[in-house]
């Protein structure tokens, strides 16, 4: 569920945050 954009969100959560948080 990890997207290429999750590189930024991974700093906030884990890496799957894009699925939950935009």
UniProtKB/Swiss-Prot annotation:
Region (Disordered): 1-22
Top-level division of the source organism's lineage: Bacteria
Keywords recorded for this protein, A-Z: Cell membrane, Membrane
Main location: membrane
Subcellular location: Cell membrane
The keyword Membrane belongs to this UniProt entry's keyword annotation: yes
An example Gene Ontology CC term for this record: plasma membrane
Functional description taken from the UniProt entry: Binds various plasma and ECM-proteins.
Name this protein carries in UniProt: 65 kDa membrane protein
Species of provenance: Staphylococcus aureus
Source taxonomy: Bacteria, Bacillati, Bacillota, Bacilli, Bacillales
